[in-house]
Amino acid sequence: MKQIIIIGCGVVGAAIAYELSLNPEFRVTVIDQAAAGQGATAAALGVGMAVISHKVKGRNWRLREASLRRYQSLIPELETLTGQAIQHNTQGILSLCFDAEDLPRWRSLQEIRQRQGYRLEIWQPEVVGDRCPHLNIDQVAAAIYSPQDFQISPSELTQALVAGARANGVELHFSQPVVGFDRADAAPESAEDGRICSAVHTATQSLATDAIVISAGLGTLPLTQTLHQPVAVGPVLGQALRIHLDTSLGQPDFQPVVNGQDIHLVPLGSGDYWVGATVEFPPETSPDTALAMQPEAERLEAVLAGAVAYCPAIAQGTITQRWSGLRPRPQGQAAPVI
């Protein structure tokens, strides 16, 4: 049986652990410096953009399509195994288009997706107003509706993945930062430099391993530097507000995720909504510098103002939660790094 150690238990590490736990050939151990899902996972809205993405071929599209298909079975699979409900929205994504010059590109994507077996609908402004009366369509040239895309709570998904992995025999060690590795000689074809990792050390234990998976987000660079195979990962800022309204926006039976000017409006049920966006930092920005650059009030007010511009009704809501957090993004290569 092959021993695999996964370093990092956000949504990515937890998903890898769960999927590997389905294979009896592997014995899986997960290590995290904190609790599950406390890093970048807590700074994500979980909007799954596959069909509506302009990626139409190559690795990026294959991964998006495979994920889209897997989630259809994964969510009920986890809920049945763990008894935990996972908040998710299967009513699609509606992306507002404010520039008519972008429409030929959307029509081209629509044709490609149709050939691939997926639906994309291009709505005229009056259709948007009819289906989503809470949206301000004054500046809207059209909207693209993707009924097969979805949204899922990253935190709830992570907890369910952890519970499912544990039920399948995965060992989990939390609050244990990795402090070092043992490396051993290997056949040249086994590793880039002819050496492999044979053990992982924390402050309290050493764990032998046949392979490691690093899913440590912004902790990736220092870990890979220790292994003499550095992978540059830089920060982007995820930020959001949770807003409560006395009644649901628009039609209660049609609550898609809405995207306008790269600001997401995510329905959570019972009159609750996330409003969130991602802020890009300059490529040379270090995580420490990025953390110091988080003027939450100023940046969050800009996000809220952007959302109010296309959905005025949320200005009447009560802000019940605010957060900002850093998410990893590879530098100098395409995401994800596999």
Per-range role (PLM):
Residues 1-12, 29:
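Beta1/beta-strand and adjacent pyrophosphate-binding region of the FAD-binding site
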Residues 5, 15-24, 33, 44-52, ...:
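Active-site substrate-recognition segment that forms the wall
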Residues 24-29, 171:
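A generic structural motif
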Residues 32, 124-125, 174-176, 182, ...:
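Short loop/edge segments at beta-strand edges and connector loops
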Residues 43, 101, 134-140, 182-188, ...:
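A short, glycine/Asx- and small/polar-enriched loop/turn
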Residues 46-131:
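Dinucleotide-binding Rossmann-like beta1-alpha1 core, especially the glycine-rich loop
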Residues 84-96, 109-111, 116, 121-168, ...:
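Helix-loop-beta segment of a Rossmann-like dinucleotide-binding subdomain
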Residues 143-189, 194-203, 207:
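Helical element adjacent to the flavin cofactor pocket in flavoenzyme catalytic cores
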